[in-house]
């Protein structure tokens, strides 16, 4: 059987080598079991949409901190099974950093439960056998995740225009190494940036940050970012209102997702991404090499109408790149 919940994945997970297989749809297991404010965790069945859980938490002043692009469609079981990551990962981490406990069913019907405790010191951490297994080892039926205070009124936005990706990677590294943790730390190349920033940065790379949380922490994070970027006089700061507007329109709702499907069928043009991560010492070389090789070696390069990329998940020892393609089908 192939587990499925929100059906938001794009990697062909329902395709199997077996001609006739069963799809186990868990979307009907859609109860929020508990929101535990004292212990700062929430428990939900696998079919609870992330957006439903998030809205329930925000009504109480809390958040999961998890906000992948698939948020309008994705459900909790699939988010854990695919080892998902969200747009605020630089502060909150990825799903593997958020999961406290789990319930799952093995192939023989055995129900296994991993308790909700802050840490384990004995043996391997079984959570990490389940997280990311994509249904190969078990069916995830229940998830408990950490929750955090939700204080959007404290959000601070910073945006910069720069000439090249190398400078942007250097700035991201300095911010991470100095210990600052903005919830958003994004670097767009000129091509990918044309989808968002032509009104103020056409033809330039763009660096974006959002600091959030306790106002003192947000203020210190923002000041630290500004101080680091000031070491690079070639970077030009833009009005924070432009970045706030971008942020408020970053995620799509179900209506816009449905409209895009219609547009793809009508035009035959669609987009896709490939993500890689790399250490600070090699990420710029990876970026330049991939872009160059696709343009010069890919036999269908002429069908690509846009090729670019952005970094949006940074770590102490490196960052990621999403390579973004628009192409004619």
Give a label for each model feature.
Residues 162, 169-329:
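C-terminal substrate-recognition/cap domain of FAD-linked oxidoreductases
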Residues 10-11, 23-25, 137-141, 218-221:
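Short, acidic (Asp/Glu-rich) active-site segment that either coordinates a divalent metal cofactor
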Residues 22, 100-104, 128-132, 138-147, ...:
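Short beta-strand elements
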Residues 30-186:
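FAD-binding subdomain of flavoenzyme oxidoreductases
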Residues 1-2, 23, 43, 65, ...:
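Structural detector of well-ordered beta-strand residues that form the stable sheet scaffold
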Residues 5-7, 69, 187-190:
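Short, ordered loop/turn segments at secondary-structure junctions
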Residues 1-29:
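Glycine-rich N-terminal segment of FAD-binding domains in flavoprotein oxidoreductases
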């Amino acid at each position: 059987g192939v587990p499925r919940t929100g059906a938001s994945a794009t990697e062909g997970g329902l395709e199997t080598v077996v001609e006739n297989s069963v799809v186990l749809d868990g979307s009907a297991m859609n109860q929020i079991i508990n929101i535990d404010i004292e212990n700062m965790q929430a428990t939900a069945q696998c079919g609870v949409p992330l957006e439903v859980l998030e809205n329930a938490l925000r009504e109480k002043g809390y958040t999961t901190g998890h906000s992948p692009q698939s948020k309008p469609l994705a459900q909790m079981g699939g988010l854990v099974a695919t080892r998902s990551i969200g747009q605020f990962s630089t502060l909150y981490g990825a799903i593997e950093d958020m999961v406290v406990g789990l319930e799952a069913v093995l192939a023989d019907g055995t129900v296994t439960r991993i308790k909700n405790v802050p840490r384990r010191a004995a043996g391997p951490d079984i959570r990490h056998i389940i997280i990311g297994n994509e249904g190969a080892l078990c069916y995830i039926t229940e998830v408990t995740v950490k929750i955090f205070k939700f204080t959007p009124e404290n959000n601070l936005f910073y945006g910069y225009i720069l000439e090249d990706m190398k400078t942007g990677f250097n700035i991201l590294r300095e911010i991470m190494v100095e210990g600052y943790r903005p919830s958003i730390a994004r670097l767009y190349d000129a091509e990918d940036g044309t989808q968002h920033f032509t009104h103020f940065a056409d033809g330039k790379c763009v660096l974006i940050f959002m600091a959030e949380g306790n106002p003192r922490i947000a203020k210190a994070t923002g000041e630290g970012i500004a101080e680091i970027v000031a070491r690079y006089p070639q970077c030009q700061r833009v009005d924070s209102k432009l970045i706030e507007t971008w942020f408020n329109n970053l995620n799509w709702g179900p209506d816009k997702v449905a409209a895009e499907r219609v547009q793809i069928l009508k035009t035959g043009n669609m987009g896709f991404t490939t993500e890689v991560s790399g250490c600070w010492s090699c990420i710029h070389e990876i970026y330049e090499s991939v872009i160059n090789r696709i343009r010069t070696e890919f036999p269908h390069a002429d069908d690509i109408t846009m090729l670019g990329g952005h970094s949006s998940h940074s770590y102490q020892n490196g960052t990621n790149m999403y390579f973004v393609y628009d192409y004619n089908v």
